[in-house]
Design a protein with these regions (language model features):
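Catalytic alpha/beta core of large soluble enzyme barrels
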Residues: 132-133, 226, 230-231, 301, ...
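Conserved phosphate/anionic-ligand binding catalytic regions in large, soluble enzymes, centered on
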Residues: 1-8, 92-132, 192-203, 246-262, ...
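Structural signal for hydrophobic packing residues in well-ordered secondary-structure cores
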Residues: 10-18, 36, 40-44, 73-76, ...
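Internal maturation/activation junctions in enzymes
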Residues: 219-241, 267-363, 434-435, 453
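A glycine-rich phosphate-binding loop feature that marks nucleotide/adenosyl-phosphate handling sites
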Residues: 1-5, 31, 52-60, 106-118, ...
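Active-site-adjacent structural elements in folded domains
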Residues: 185-189, 236-247, 260, 264, ...
Length: 490
């Protein structure tokens, strides 16, 4: 949110205003950082910059970002604009409420928990905001070729001291210069392909698979299947194939949470709900990591394993803060049915087959096909019409009966902080993210309520939220439009 054109960015999907300055078919997102959120809380000043003067901010996070940002604020030689952080935050939330975007993603939360922080940085998420993997844009290097045929390459903005004693960016060096006593014969640009994240997704149906024994049996097979997809897939772009083969990233998620809760007569937002999903997600996390480690013995480690958090025995739950841990206490601070220390030793010894493991996709189509509820969401209503890329589909919640009716709480009837807390419990066990929608009726909407929801999401360590879905209480609209979701995540 430090881009000097952020106000125009926030207006991209508005229906009013100059149409040439709108982009209705794009899905913008904001990459929010801790420093901005802290200044919103403190009602402090926020500085906007020209991105060409501050390119390095895109790859920094945490204390490194804050330190560099504050240095740039003091730099009088670059273009900047000062605004009230709270006013900008209000505009962000207003745009989010009016248009459903920009999606809000939390840069520092994502990168702090990045299992492959040794090999790059997470710069963004995907359309459905559950994929968090290292990416890198295509770029050019400057290649100096000497008369002998030898060559050396530098990044375009990397400072080079030529023999005349002048220090300048590599892109400013010419064939009239010399390096190390060698005249430069030719200066060329060489293209370097970046890294593109890939979604290799599957979901465990919690309405059928929700006990320790069932998860122990099913998850290793799911991990093996997803790993096979990487090798068997068709890749239209070579750099996508290279990235996928190098990181071997998969995204095992869940669907059917609402059905599982209803059939077990558990109300949304109760402590029983929190305990149940904590138990289930722990089992999925443990078995996913263990299965990937076993595959590493059989097929080999992924190329970037050495130096990763996996190699150091650091797992997703190690990033959970005290507030999240205190949401669930299953007997002792971290009571568990699994031997986590043994698994850490195993992973450090055997390695991992896959660099990224878990991500919860929206599953708006496959959940209907399999006869369960969508992903991790409460139901839209007990009966409604689902509009997605397949058309308009009549839907009734699974196994609706007098016994389950009360436990299928419609999403718009819930306090949305419950969804945030439940997501934080899941996030404790997920190395990537979740596609998390927020549901608000107009009679409940207020700036204070929206601020409470999204501030809580940031504080509890969530990496993203998806759509902010709003509905007027007077309008009897039984159609839930999901047609704008990513095809791969449906």
């Amino acid at each position: 949110p430090w881009h000097i054109d952020i106000n125009d960015f926030l207006d991209l999907k508005k229906n009013s205003g100059e149409e040439r300055r709108r982009a209705h078919d794009l899905f913008p997102a904001l990459w929010l950082n801790d420093l901005f959120m802290e200044r919103v809380q403190a009602d402090d000043i926020w500085t906007l910059f020209d991105p060409y003067d501050t390119r390095e901010l895109a790859t920094l996070f945490g204390e490194d970002f804050s330190s560099r940002y504050e240095e740039l604020e003091k730099n009088e030689s670059i273009i900047k604009e000062k605004v009230k952080a709270k006013n900008l935050w209000k505009k962000i939330l207003t745009s989010y409420f009016e248009t459903g975007s920009p999606f809000l993603c939390f840069k520092d939360n994502a990168n702090r928990a990045n299992p492959n922080d040794h090999y790059g940085v997470i710069r963004s998420s995907n359309l459905c905001t559950e994929i968090f993997q290292n990416t890198e844009p295509n770029h050019y290097k400057i290649k100096f070729i000497f008369e002998s045929g030898e060559s050396i390459s530098y990044e375009e903005d990397e400072l080079v001291t030529v023999d005349s004693g002048i220090e300048k960016p590599a892109k400013k060096v010419t064939a009239l210069d010399s390096l190390g006593g060698l005249p430069i014969y030719v200066v060329e640009k060489e293209k370097v392909d970046g890294a593109t994240a890939v979604c290799n997704l599957a979901s465990v149906n919690l309405s059928r698979i929700n006990t320790k024994e069932e998860i122990d049996r099913i998850v290793p097979t799911a991990v093996r299947c997803l790993d096979n997809v990487i090798d068997l897939n068709f890749y239209p772009i070579e750099k996508v194939k290279r990235t996928n083969m190098r990181s071997r990233s998969i995204g095992l998620g869940v669907m059917g949470e609402a059905q599982m809760l209803a059939e077990q007569e558990i109300m949304w937002g109760t402590q029983e709900h929190f305990d149940k999903i904590d138990e289930v997600m722990e089992a999925i996390c443990y078995n996913t990591i263990s299965a990937s480690s076993d595959l590493a013995v059989e097929k080999g480690q992924y190329a970037e394993f050495q130096g990763s958090k996996w190699s150091r025995g650091i797992f997703p739950q190690d990033h959970a803060n005290a507030e999240v841990i205190n949401l669930v206490d299953r007997g002792g601070l971290f009571a568990s049915a699994y031997e986590w220390e043994e698994l850490r030793t195993k992973v450090k010894s055997q390695g991992m087959r896959n660099g990224y493991l878990m991500a919860v996709a929206p599953t708006s189509s496959i959940s209907i096909l399999t006869g369960t509820t969508q992903a991790i969401e409460p139901v839209f209503k007990r009966k409604w019409f689902e509009e997605n890329l397949s058309g308009l589909i009549p839907v009734v919640v699974p196994n609706l009966s007098p016994d389950t009716y009360a436990y299928y709480t419609p999403a718009y009837d819930l306090n949305q902080t419950i969804l945030i807390k439940a997501a934080a419990i899941r996030q404790k066990w997920i190395d990537q993210g979740q596609s998390l929608n927020i549901f608000i009726t107009l009679d409940k909407a207020s700036g204070k309520y929206l601020n409470e929801i999204y501030m809580l999401a940031w504080k509890l360590g969530l990496k993203s939220t998806y759509y902010l879905r709003s509905q007027s209480p007077e309008v009897k609209n039984d159609v839930e439009d999901r047609s704008m979701e990513c095809v791969g995540c449906q």
